[in-house]
From Swiss-Prot:
Activity regulation info: Na(+) is not transported, but it plays an essential structural role and its presence is essential for fluoride channel function.
HAMAP family, per the entry: FluC (MF_00454)
Stretches that traverse the bilayer: 5-25, 39-59, 69-89, 103-123
Organism expressing this protein natively: Nitrobacter winogradskyi (strain ATCC 25391 / DSM 10237 / CIP 104748 / NCIMB 11846 / Nb-255)
Name of the protein this chain belongs to: Fluoride-specific ion channel FluC
Main location class: membrane
Gene Ontology cellular-component terms listed: plasma membrane
Keywords noted in UniProt: Cell inner membrane, Cell membrane, Ion channel, Ion transport, Membrane, Metal-binding, Sodium, Transmembrane, Transmembrane helix, Transport
């Protein structure tokens, strides 16, 4: 275990978490709290971002491992919110909003995987 990797995760995680918080608050103020649009947006854009990083690491970027860990594990890990997604789904189900819960689950997974694929494809094209 290298301390540089731990510090990279901590620093990136702090930045990603702050970004997630600000985006979530912004969406809540913009669209209201009834549906977890902020979490959906965060998961989709986080998947796009990690796809772009993966694509760049594979073909273009020759970054040190600590930098890769900072970007992917730190920033993307701090930014994406799968655990929050699970809790938001539970709340929708608990309120009896089964159609919203199903749409949210399917939409989150399909759009996030699609965004990851798009991120990799973007890098392959440019």
């Amino acid at each position: 275990m290298k301390w540089t990797f731990i510090l990279a995760v901590a620093a990136g995680g702090a930045l990603g978490s702050v970004a997630r918080y600000l985006v979530g608050i912004g969406f809540g103020k913009w669209l209201g709290p009834k549906f977890p649009w902020g979490t959906l947006f965060i998961n989709v854009t986080g998947s796009l971002l990690i796809g772009i990083f993966a694509g760049l690491f594979a073909v273009r970027w020759s970054l040190p491992q600590a930098a890769r860990i900072f970007l992917v594990v730190g920033i993307c890990g701090g930014y994406t919110t799968f655990s929050t997604f699970s809790l938001d789904t539970f709340y929708l189900i608990e309120r009896g909003e089964m159609a919203s819960a199903a749409a949210y689950m399917i939409g989150s997974v399909v759009l996030s995987v699609g965004a990851l694929i798009a991120g990799i494809q973007i890098v392959r094209v440019i």
